[in-house]
Design a protein with these regions (language model features):
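Near-N-terminal "mature-domain entry" segment
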Residues: 17-48
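Catalytic cores and adjacent binding grooves of peptidoglycan-active enzymes
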Residues: 22-27, 110-168
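Short, surface-exposed glycine/acidic/tryptophan-bearing loops
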Residues: 40-41, 47-48, 95-122
Length: 168
């Protein structure tokens, strides 16, 4: 009888582990690179997966990588779950170097002088299968950081900075 309960407990633990598993698929639209990573939390993701994420989200204009806030990846998987679709994102922008940020500002693009992109704390994305206004609403409701809505450019900005919002 005890063995039966132990087996049931192990099965429940295994199911719980499976339920907490996060899968994130990113496609960088500047070059078409694609990456899929699976993790439970920041402590169990493989170091080479973190390196691959850093590379995929690099500033493609100057080919410079930067560490990304792991909270972004958790936030992206949570948003996809709430939208009821797989976490399959198209990435418009991840890390942005200070030099690139300054060039974009000088060219008249609407980028913040102290952009969270320069800190590796922001990402501009589209979530496949989730309407853009719904993705924005879910990100706003989560209250985990900044949310920018760019309907003309067709993306949502999410970051792990202070809670705030804006629109194109």
């Amino acid at each position: 009888m005890t063995v039966g309960w132990v087996m049931l407990a192990l099965a429940a633990l295994a199911a719980g582990d499976e339920a907490s598993l996060r899968r994130l698929e990113l496609t960088n639209l500047h070059g078409g690179e694609k990456l899929t990573v699976t993790f439970h939390n920041e402590h169990d993701i493989a170091p080479d997966a973190l390196g691959a994420l850093r590379h995929l989200l690099r500033d493609y204009r100057v080919n410079k990588e930067h560490a990304m806030d792991f909270g972004l990846f958790v936030q992206l998987t949570d948003l996809a779950r709430q939208c009821g679709v797989p976490a399959s994102y198209e990435v418009i922008s991840g890390y942005r170097s200070p030099a690139t940020n300054a060039k974009l500002r000088a060219a008249g693009h609407a980028v913040a002088e102290r952009s969270q992109h320069m800190e590796g704390r922001a990402i501009d994305v589209r979530l496949k299968g989730c309407p853009l206004p719904r993705l924005r609403d879910l990100a706003l409701a989560a209250g985990r950081g900044g949310v920018g809505f760019y309907p003309r450019s067709h993306f949502v900005h999410v970051d792990t900075g202070r809670v705030r919002s804006w629109q194109e």
